[in-house]
From Swiss-Prot:
Keywords: Disulfide bond, Secreted, Signal. It is found in: Secreted. This is Short form salivary protein D7S. Disulfide bonds join C33-C67, C47-C155, C109-C125. SUPFAM superfamilies: Insect pheromone/odorant-binding proteins. GO terms for cellular component: extracellular region. InterPro entries: PBP/GOBP, PBP_GOBP_sf. In contrast to the related D7 salivary proteins, does not bind serotonin. It comes from Culex quinquefasciatus (Southern house mosquito). It holds the Pfam family PBP_GOBP.
Length: 161
């Protein structure tokens, strides 16, 4: 019988995802990066993208994350990750004594992936640090252009103001 073997194959197949729990990053709206989101993407997925809670390593997601990282100043012109820009954000958010821990966490994670320009892998490594959401939320608070207004918001209006 083919049906039981197909059912078993489906049950054993587990898609790989990067996020199982919310990061705690508030929704942000970066206008140039919105063009990277396919117009057919539903509101829930757009909400997750804007919170950097991206699960699948697709071309759309890579393009969006790469754009966000460029806007943050985390990628240089060659697409390489700028660790100093990340540390600068940590310092501005009040985490001045975490440089070594942040860099060790990032470098250790990237060692598993090997050298790669893949923005999704960089996102995975950057978000390993538990304080990264606080850093990004602090940066969002400093830049009012990154706060979506009620028309642009996909995640609800409770966290907008």
């Amino acid at each position: 019988m083919k049906f039981p073997s197909i059912l078993l194959a489906i049950l054993l197949f587990k898609p790989i995802t990067a996020r199982f729990t919310p990061l705690g990053i508030d929704e942000f709206y970066i206008k140039p990066c919105e063009r990277k989101i396919v117009y057919t993407t539903d509101k829930h997925d757009k909400c997750l993208m804007r919170r950097l809670e991206i699960e699948m390593d697709t071309g759309e997601n890579q393009g969006y994350v790469k754009c966000v990282f460029k806007e943050f100043g985390y990628l240089n012109g060659e697409g390489q990750f700028n660790k100093q820009a990340l540390l600068k954000d940590y310092h501005q958010a009040g985490f001045k004594n975490k440089d070594k821990a942040v860099l060790e966490s990032y470098d250790g994670c990237m060692k598993n992936y090997g050298p790669t320009p893949n923005a999704m892998k960089i996102l995975d490594c950057v978000t390993k640090d538990k304080d990264f959401p606080k850093v990004i939320n602090a940066r969002r608070e400093r830049n009012s252009d990154w706060k979506p207004d009620w028309i642009q918001a996909y995640c609800g209006v409770t966290k907008l103001f």
